[in-house]
Regions:
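Short consensus segments that form the blades of beta-propeller domains
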Residues: 42, 72-78, 129-132, 185-187, ...
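Cellulosome-associated attachment modules in secreted, modular CAZymes
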Residues: 529-618
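Calcium-coordinating acidic loop motifs
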Residues: 54-61, 89-90, 115-122, 144-145, ...
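Hydrophobic beta-strand segments that make up the repeating blades of beta-propeller
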Residues: 64-69, 125-130, 181-186, 234-239, ...
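Repeat-based blade/solenoid architectures
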Residues: 39-52, 100-113, 156-169, 210-222, ...
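Beta-propeller blade repeat segments, especially FG-GAP/WD-type strand-to-loop junctions
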Residues: 24-34, 73-97, 135-152, 190-207, ...
Length: 618
């Protein structure tokens, strides 16, 4: 049976726009709407630190968790500020649904990251938090039912009490189907990172021999299979200050040799950067099938920054520093770096978040497709301007196929400086796109660590191959949406899509139409779509009677938003103006004419009323 691929949720019409900027630098144009409201900005919360997109309630709309660090008290200590969970209402508005547990006010928050730790279909949340007095700690919140969270931190090893945990990254390192957690630590206990193994039932144990032998100041974690051997590797950015020994800020790349054996290979791979790293990000910038690496650096003054580094993956386990030739060689004071294809042309672009008392601007670089980048907007409000940034997270929050950008400000200065911003992407240039959401069955339910690869024919380029990883933590104190987003330019058909799951299962399908969001369930035998989001194949739902398929198109009725299948005269999944025109063209016709919804032998007023009652133009 041929499957028809359907949108996960309908495309949303966008409402009121607060402000609009269209910026040109050289010949480049970038267009964004600043749709920030006081709620989204985090007004009333001081010194923001991180943000994580998720769909905690499984309604198909991406929600936002904001981590706040706090402000100084009269004694010079930071006071924690309650974190917030904002529910996406689906109409470009958000609602604060924060509960006492979600405030996570047990410490000074850094990095939030979502993952389904118990594979129950509900995302859970870990927030790394530091302490002023040694009693505050990090927190793990399990989602017991939609919107109901329990604190299951329950002491060590999860609390990380007395430490300064920074970046975190979820990954199933032992391939048991349970997601594990690596935490970068930048102080205390010999500054050793923490590898926490998920035992199930909400319990974790520290595996002390992994990623913690050397004294480093860990800042960010990035899991990625950089050598394409189907084993997850990890890069750790270490960011000590000038007064510290250079060895404490040498970044690390741990190569996974299998069977629980790891080898630190940063020097031989050419990525042992020592420039006060904060954030880093993996991505295939040139679509050659190898993941490249961008590292953001900073120095301890507002006037001079570390040079960020762009490393091209050579495909043989080594990297080449192409920072200069790529046009990325500039001195910034960078906290967060990120990649996304904001213009849907098929190439990953780079966004840089800078910070400091001098309020250096953020920067957006457009990928030219030839291993070079062009700066789109210099210090422009369209990309966040100058606001002492802390983090940046990408997500298609309005489900229109164009990734939007949430910026986290880190200032405790005057009101309005350093407030968070939500920038809606309005760079609609006619390019096509595809978004893929995954649900693991043998693998961890969140599908973190999965790799999605697509192939399509693009005019002037021939066969193009693109790949995206599902990542839990990226950049610095950030989590992008757990969807794979592809811009495909002018291509109108995706010839093939392959999903390589963490379990080793590989799924493949051909002939996918663009401009839609699809959800796929891990399955060895079939490419299983999951439009109703229950992590069961639509075909299984229909076969077992869990869903109805009135028109026999292999799509559950609840996914077609029609209440009367007979009113969908042309069978396209919607009752709309096309069906109305069919009725009009056959008005008063007798016999078995198209448009006779009630089956009384004539097309007339009763059929029109039935059509109006079932109207669902979606």
């Amino acid at each position: 049976m041929k499957l028809k691929i359907t949108k996960l949720v309908p495309i949303i019409a966008i409402g009121v726009q607060m402000s609009h900027y269209s910026i040109a630098a050289s010949t480049e144009t970038s267009s964004w709407d600043n749709v920030t409201t006081p709620l989204i900005a985090g007004v009333g919360h001081e010194n923001h630190r991180g943000a994580a997109w998720c769909d905690y309630d499984n309604d198909g709309f991406l929600d936002l968790y904001m981590a706040h660090f706090g402000a100084f008290d009269p004694d010079g200590l930071y006071l924690g500020s309650p974190n917030q969970l904002l529910k996406n209402l689906g109409d470009t508005e958000f609602e604060d649904v924060t509960t006492l547990e979600l405030e996570a006010n047990s410490g000074l928050s850094h990095h939030p990251a979502w993952a389904d730790i118990d594979n129950d279909g509900l995302l859970d949340l870990f927030v790394s938090q530091s302490s002023n007095n040694g009693t505050e700690h990090s927190i793990l919140l399990r989602q017991d039912s939609i919107g109901v969270f329990s604190d299951i931190t329950d002491g060590e090893p999860l609390q990380l009490g007395g430490l300064l945990p920074r970046g975190i990254g979820w990954q199933d390192i032992n391939n048991d189907g349970l997601i594990d957690l690596l935490v970068a630590v930048s102080n205390g206990d010999a500054m050793q990172n923490r590898m926490l193994i998920n035992l199930g039932g909400g319990s974790f144990i520290r595996q002390s021999s992994l990623f913690s032998d050397e004294y480093k100041e860990g800042r960010s974690i990035g899991w990625c299979d950089y050598n394409n051997d189907n084993l997850p590797d990890v890069y750790i950015a270490n960011g000590a200050e000038d007064h510290c020994d250079v060895s404490e800020r040498t970044n690390q790349l741990f190569k996974n040799l299998g069977d629980g054996v790891w080898e630190e290979v940063a020097s031989e791979a050419g990525v042992a950067e020592t420039g006060h790293a904060r954030g880093h990000v993996w991505g295939d910038i040139n679509n050659d099938g190898h993941m490249d690496l961008f590292v953001g650096n900073q120095k301890g003054s507002d006037t001079g920054g570390g040079f960020n580094r762009l490393f091209e993956n050579n495909g043989d386990g080594t990297f080449t520093d192409i920072t200069v030739s790529a046009g990325m060689y500039a001195s910034f004071r960078t906290r967060c770096v990120s990649m996304a294809d904001y213009d849907n042309d098929g190439f990953l672009d780079i966004y840089i978040v800078n910070f400091g008392g001098a309020l250096p601007p953020n920067h957006l670089f457009r990928n030219n497709g030839d291993n070079t980048f062009t700066e789109v907007a210099i210090g422009s409000p369209a990309v966040g301007g100058s606001f002492n940034g802390a983090a940046a997270s990408w997500a298609d929050y309005d489900n229109d196929g164009w990734v939007d950008l949430y910026l986290v400000g880190g200032s405790i200065n005057a009101p309005g400086i350093g407030q968070n911003q939500l920038l809606r992407n309005t760079n609609q240039n006619g390019n096509h796109w595809l978004e893929v959401e995954l649900c693991g069955t043998e693998s961890n339910r969140s599908a973190i660590g999965a790799r999605v690869t697509i192939k399509h024919i693009k005019s002037g380029q021939g066969l193009v191959t693109q790949m995206r990883d599902i990542q839990s933590g990226t950049g610095y104190n950030s989590q992008n949406m757990l969807r794979a987003h592809f811009g495909i330019g002018s291509s109108t058909t995706i010839i093939n899509m392959t999903i390589r799951w963490p379990s080793g299962v590989v799924q493949s399908i051909g002939g996918i139409l663009p401009d839609q969001i699809i959800r796929v369930v891990e399955d060895e035998d079939t490419f299983a779509f999951d439009c109703n989001r229950n992590c069961v194949s639509d075909l299984v739902d229909i076969a077992e009677g869990l869903s109805q398929d009135t028109n026999g198109n292999a799509i559950p009725d609840e996914c077609e938003c029609i209440t009367d299948a007979d009113a969908d005269i042309n069978g396209d999944g919607s009752v709309n103006v096309i069906d109305l025109l069919i009725i009009i063209s056959n008005w008063d016709a007798e016999g078995s004419s198209e448009g006779d919804i009630d089956g009384d032998g004539i097309v007339g007023i009763q059929d029109l009323l039935l059509l109006i009652g079932a109207w669902s133009d979606c």
